[in-house]
């Protein structure tokens, strides 16, 4: 006999409230056939590769820190296209539309030859090589050595209209009921911060705050011992609902373990042995050595490698070549909101450090009788050279209610910059206006300063590049512009071999010549 029974499985119902859907910029932004080329000047920077150099007082910065292992974050400021005096006013209707920029092409050019730079520490915390050790070393009070190595090789750039989001591990606050004990390993947590210009990249020791988590100041090299190494949080940026921080990126990393060492110092986490409980873990991890052997006192188990970036070659370069943006990974398909663009770059394949030696005595070098190393001062300098070229496309944003609602939810300050003509309700029908505000009889004028629009990234360090007067419509006059015209098929070849833009839409014919008999 067939009997109906209710299903015992769980029933999943849709949410009672609708989920807000974020539209892609391709759904409401109209692209035009107007393209601009923009490029920066030759951007140069010089400094010390390991640390900042201050004067004797320690207050005035004389030589900044410039390392090949640092992030370079360029903040490119573009002109407002809504203030352009366009020759063809039929491009857009200012009463119903606004203009924005879209990135279509990018080329990050780097100067200087390829080279490997070394880093290290004169008091590096290592006992001995643990890969090919020939005697048992248990360590002493101070086992630090002067050690250097080459960092992990990394080439990377991230392009977006907001700063790149980085991640690093930081010291966390303990629980409220946990007793504070000296020498106990603190809890750590993952932190998300913007990557700023000058932040150190991971060179093989991880992405963490070495200033707070390594108090002996000798576990890593000099360039990161007092710094925080950050790594781009690709997972967070790829899952961003708007996709402004990362339109696209290119990355190439490589390393291998070159040397294997062990740390000096007292072990914080002992290897489980007979001292635990009633001895039920005895001889599970090791058997103690005899008293007449060097192995009677167990050594440290804090093993670590020093990595190497290996071969640097021009065959695997991400720079000095164009990249074309057809489809971004997020909802923002290359639209540069707020007329700005952030380019985050790391490249330590041009990591050569210059060694400069200067004779300290007041004497001509030709008159030096014999060599004395103490009379020569050695200096280190690192130089970097950049140039960035862009292909920008002019786009139109319709001033519709649903479009403005999404832009307002994304970034309400964009609507303020567009000056849409919204008249707010006056808070006070009458205001005070002084005639002689500069006289001694009235109050100080500083109490009534003009309100300036706050910078959303105030307090962050970027390499700001003003490109408001660097745009050109003559794409064929620039290297990246010619590549774009050829790549997009916007050029056609004439009879004599020259090229013209296909936007003219005119037929090109050769001159008819009379045949020779």
From Swiss-Prot:
Key word Disulfide bond present: yes
Keywords: Capsid protein, Disulfide bond, Host nucleus, Host-virus interaction, Late protein, T=7 icosahedral capsid protein, Viral attachment to host cell, Viral penetration into host cytoplasm, Virion, Virus endocytosis by host, Virus entry into host cell
Gene3D superfamilies per the UniProt record, alphabetical: Major capsid L1 (late) superfamily, Papillomavirus
Protein name: Major capsid protein L1
Chain segments carrying region Disordered: 497-517
GO molecular function, one term: structural molecule activity
Cross-referenced InterPro entries: Capsid_L1_Papillomavir (IPR002210), Capsid_L1_sf_Papillomavir (IPR036973), dsDNA_vir_gr_I_capsid (IPR011222)
Organism: Human papillomavirus 12
GO CC annotations on file: host cell nucleus; T=7 icosahedral viral capsid
Family membership: Belongs to the papillomaviridae L1 protein family.
UniProt record, GO biological process: endocytosis involved in viral entry into host cell; virion attachment to host cell
Biased composition, class Polar residues, residue ranges: 497-509
Top-rank lineage group of the source organism: Viruses
Function, as annotated: Forms an icosahedral capsid with a T=7 symmetry and a 50 nm diameter. The capsid is composed of 72 pentamers linked to each other by disulfide bonds and associated with L2 proteins. Binds to heparan sulfate proteoglycans on cell surface of basal layer keratinocytes to provide initial virion attachment. This binding mediates a conformational change in the virus capsid that facilitates efficient infection. The virion enters the host cell via endocytosis. During virus trafficking, L1 protein dissociates from the viral DNA and the genomic DNA is released to the host nucleus.
Keyword Disulfide bond annotated: yes
Subunit structure: Self-assembles into homopentamers. The capsid has an icosahedral symmetry and consists of 72 capsomers, with each capsomer being a pentamer of L1. Interacts with the minor capsid protein L2; this interaction is necessary for viral genome encapsidation. Interacts with protein E2; this interaction enhances E2-dependent replication and transcription activation.
Residues annotated as signal peptide: none
Subcellular location: Virion; Host nucleus
Any single Pfam family the record assigns to this protein: Late_protein_L1
